[in-house]
Amino acid sequence: TMLLAGLKSGELDLGIGRMSDPELMSGLNYELLFLESLKLVVRPNHPLLQDTVTLSRVMEWPVVVSPKGTVPRQNAEALLQMQGCTLPSGCIETLSASLSRQLTVDYDYVWFVPSGAVKDDLRRGVLTALPVTSPGAGEPIGILTRVDAPLSEGAQTLLSAIRKSMPL
């Protein structure tokens, strides 16, 4: 990815992201910040919320999901597979949070999304999480730095602020 390439070339001092393939992480340090769960979200007045929510019922509605090959997509497919479900044909595949949010807020779409991407929308009541539990503790999100290069004072100050802002 561009983040890993930028770190390895020295163009970037640090990055924050998901844990990658261990082969791609050679030469980099990884410090876990938090685990991010997968959420299934809808608009607050979505018809799904009027009855018992099951994954098979969710799959009767239009779905927005990350493209194949992404970690959120893999997590969505694992969740569905555990319940004997598959993504409906014709689901929207996009990395655009703004498009996904718009489809979910304005229409009856169900969005499979990492929790951090919709934290504020959930808190403000713009979106509602369906009562569906995703498998595992969540995706590891952390700080990436180069093994062979000390961080500048500014980068160290930034990392200190990031660490202090993380919940225990």
Give the positions of each predicted feature:
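Short beta-strand-to-loop elements that line the ligand-binding cleft
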Residues: 65, 86-96
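A ligand-binding cleft/hinge motif common to bilobed small-molecule-binding domains
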Residues: 16-25, 78, 82, 97-127
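Short helix-initiation/N-cap motifs at beta->coil->alpha
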Residues: 1-5, 92-101
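Hydrophobic residues within well-ordered alpha-helices
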Residues: 6-8, 58, 102-108, 143
